[in-house]
A protein has these predicted regions:
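A short helix-turn-beta junction within AAA+ P-loop NTPase domains corresponding to the substrate/partner-engaging
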Residues: 142-160
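Conserved catalytic/switch belt of AAA+ P-loop NTPases
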Residues: 54, 97-123
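Conserved AAA+/SF3 P-loop NTPase catalytic/coupling segment centered on the Walker-B
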Residues: 80-107, 140-147
Length: 167
């Protein structure tokens, strides 16, 4: 409740976590953008879910940072969960472009996505990954108010104390 005090938002997150854990090969047709203050514990809140779906080594998780979003290589597309870490486009003009680049990954159709691997021919993979984005920026991406591809929540929780972070 510290990170997501709104009951409806929290219930939606529990539903997402339960569904993807029970149905890892089924697409959740929207992404979650969890924003909040750095060090507040957003990624810690999601850690048990990631472990449940991806295993103790998180082998079926694609971790994507800002630089990788612009890469032609699509290794993360093979994952069950794609994590967009520190989602942020500093320029307003590029925020809309980022949202457009993410559309086919977040929702299906398309049913298939093309994976480019260095030294190999491109191939198609089923578009079933769940996209989870984190940001410390209050405006990390520009999306229209009626876009159903994103479930966005902002945690007002303060930075965790050092003792809390060690638990």
């Amino acid at each position: 409740r510290r990170l997501v005090p709104d009951e409806a938002e929290l219930n939606h997150l529990w539903d997402i976590m339960a569904f993807k854990t029970q149905n890892p090969r089924v697409k959740i047709n929207h992404a979650v953008l969890h924003g909040g203050h750095g060090g507040s514990g957003k990624d810690t809140m999601w850690a048990p879910f990631l472990w449940a779906v991806c295993g103790p080594g998180l082998v079926n998780r694609g971790l994507v940072d800002g630089d990788s979003l612009n890469s032609q290589w699509g290794y993360a597309l093979e994952s069950e969960i794609i994590i967009l870490n520190e989602l942020k486009e500093p320029e307003a003009a590029t925020r809309r472009a980022l949202a457009n680049r993410l559309k086919p990954i977040i929702a299906a159709p398309p049913e298939m996505l093309t994976v480019n691997r260095k030294g190999l021919h491109p191939y198609d993979t089923v578009n079933r990954a769940f996209v989870l984005a984190f940001s410390n920026d209050p405006v990390p991406i520009t999306i229209s108010s009626d876009d159903r591809r994103w479930f966005v929540l902002w945690s007002q929780a303060p930075i965790m104390a050092e003792a809390e972070a060690k638990l």
